[in-house]
Amino acid sequence: MAMDEYLWMVILGFIIAFILAFSVGANDVANSFGTAVGSGVVTLRQACILASIFETTGSVLLGAKVGETIRKGIIDVNLYNETVETLMAGEVSAMVGSAVWQLIASFLRLPISGTHCIVGSTIGFSLVAIGTKGVQWMELVKIVASWFISPLLSGFMSGLLFVLIRIFILKKEDPVPNGLRALPVFYAATIAINVFSIMYTGAPVLGLVLPMWAIALISFGVALLFAFFVWLFVCPWMRRKITGKLQKEGALSRVSDESLSKVQEAESPVFKELPGAKANDDSTIPLTGAAGETLGTSEGTSAGSHPRAAYGRALSMTHGSVKSPISNGTFGFDGHTRSDGHVYHTVHKDSGLYKDLLHKIHIDRGPEEKPAQESNYRLLRRNNSYTCYTAAICGLPVHATFRAADSSAPEDSEKLVGDTVSYSKKRLRYDSYSSYCNAVAEAEIEAEEGGVEMKLASELADPDQPREDPAEEEKEEKDAPEVHLLFHFLQVLTACFGSFAHGGNDVSNAIGPLVALWLIYKQGGVTQEAATPVWLLFYGGVGICTGLWVWGRRVIQTMGKDLTPITPSSGFTIELASAFTVVIASNIGLPVSTTHCKVGSVVAVGWIRSRKAVDWRLFRNIFVAWFVTVPVAGLFSAAVMALLMYGILPYV
């Protein structure tokens, strides 16, 4: 059959296929390196370079088998024997519908499934062309089932692996020995799965036809050699690196403790009475007496009683005014009487009282000290700023947030917060005492006008309920330095593995219809008996990489950071288990969604780490998008198919 008159559709198909590959790279690239970028083991530029290499390699070696499912497994191509041009127009329509919806989703930073798009688009044009009889519904049912199986299976595998790692490595007092013992196993498992995938799926491309047992034996042998190499060279090097890092951090910690001890010995803990501090009866209220007394006193406090320090109380503002700084470096809140009858003051950092305060808090801590109060002490010592020690004296809660991206401003923002009050002074000059006093004054006035009870964060909860230590929550969200080193390169390796699997699976979403279009044009029929050309797979890989570099960062933010915090240890389990699921599915020719596998793994591991770590609202939106994608892509494809069938083909 002469097909030259339809050459225009082939040319149009190549253009649209590249746009479709671009959209796949812009949206689905977050499945490969999103978690690696989110955990900080690679930068965005490094992720793009690595992904470009492994996406292209995976598309060439693994993409052929899944491409066959996309081309011939969803619709019955034999029904188009007499209307070849209709099938060609349908393939073009499928690519247009899928590309348009994925570009829209990428613009909206919404991670969707490229597999969903192409399947929905294929069904859409078939319904317009020959109705429901053109769809192989049983194959569609299997594909739909895989959409649910893939996140559940990937999530289960990731969760199981993470639980084992947490029990045997992360929760140990010294995680290094077990971590080093497990490194060869982790590397061997990663390499074995990767080699098996290449040998099994890519063997025909490489000109190798081997039985299953031979492929398994080769994969196992390569994995053993790699494990031996890791045990012989990588583990000793990693042990030396971790030991050196821990020794360096230990030395810095000792220097910090010695500095504090010298400060405490240099000043005797004698607190002076502050002028300008008045109680309701106009009598002067001293900040404190001897070292054993509290920071605030009242008439109701009997001699010899020692209430806890002010930073451990729930305090409320009733009335008062703010005075300007006093010459001796103090700052008085004249008449600020709290609900407990105490009067509290702000002192200057250079007045000498700050050192006494440090000593007071240090000796006031007992073995029964609550975790939240312990956290306040660490916060005070770490920040050494006006905000922190004022919080300790005046009962104002402090939430310190540091922007790692701005190394020049490690104390970029500190907030004074109440139940409904939030005051933030960006880039506050802590060496300027007056600017700090203004910040405190504004927070106090805001609390006065709103009638808000100002409380310490440690006292906001019910005192009868067990308190959660913010420091412990932060520790739970981050890996220890030695654990970070153990899993750093391992997550990079698994991310490359995931990118390889992504290229093998998702290149078919972009190139499957183009391959069908090309083979129909070359053979003059719909049978498509020839193998998938390698150069077409490479063409799709180039398009995916282009989309990654231009627009990939938009969805990386959603997958790598917004859904749940990622650490190297959790990222490793997410990458390995989800990539394993995708590779297995690719090898059996089942078009699973890499988005579903990765989302399932991220949510499962995040939920196991902490019930509060997962953004369930975002997960709900993603879950809804899974169902919306198929009909929306189908509608776009059906509209284009109707235009081609009834508006263009009859006149060509």
Curated annotation (Swiss-Prot):
Result, substituting residue 115 to M: In IBGC1; loss of sodium-dependent phosphate transport but no effect on cell membrane localization
Extent of Polar residues compositional bias: 295-304
Outcome recorded upon mutating residue 637 to R: In IBGC1; loss of sodium-dependent phosphate transport but no effect on cell membrane localization
Region feature Disordered, mapped onto this chain: 273-307, 458-477
Keywords from the named record: Cell membrane, Disease variant, Glycoprotein, Host cell receptor for virus entry, Host-virus interaction, Ion transport, Membrane, Phosphate transport, Phosphoprotein, Receptor, Sodium, Sodium transport, Symport, Transmembrane, Transmembrane helix, Transport
GO molecular function: phosphate transmembrane transporter activity; signaling receptor activity; sodium:phosphate symporter activity; virus receptor activity
An annotated GO cellular component: plasma membrane
Effect of residue 184 to L: In IBGC1; uncertain significance
Reactions catalysed, as given in the entry: 2 Na(+)(out) + phosphate(out) = 2 Na(+)(in) + phosphate(in)
Phenotypic consequence of residue 498 to R: In IBGC1; substantially impaired phosphate transport
Annotated effect of mutating residue 28 to N: In IBGC1; Impairs phosphate transport; no effect on retroviral receptor function
Locations listed in the record: Cell membrane; Apical cell membrane
Domain of life, per lineage: Eukaryota
Tissue distribution: Ubiquitously expressed.
Known glycosylation sites: 81
GO biological process, one term: monoatomic ion transport
Spans within the Cytoplasmic topological domain: 27-46, 108-109, 164-190, 235-482, 552-571, 610-621
Modified residues (Phosphoserine): 253, 256, 259, 268, 316, 385
Transmembrane spans: 6-26, 47-67, 87-107, 110-130, 143-163, 191-211, 214-234, 483-503, 531-551, 572-586, 594-609, 622-642
Extracellular-side positions: 1-5, 68-86, 131-142, 212-213, 504-530, 587-593, 643-652
Record-linked Pfam families: PHO4
Membrane topology: Multi-pass membrane protein
Inducing stimuli: Increased by phosphate depletion in osteosarcoma cell lines.
Protein family according to the UniProt entry: Belongs to the inorganic phosphate transporter (PiT) (TC 2.A.20) family.
Oligomer status and interactors: Homodimer.
The name this protein goes by in its record: Sodium-dependent phosphate transporter 2
Organism: Homo sapiens (Human)
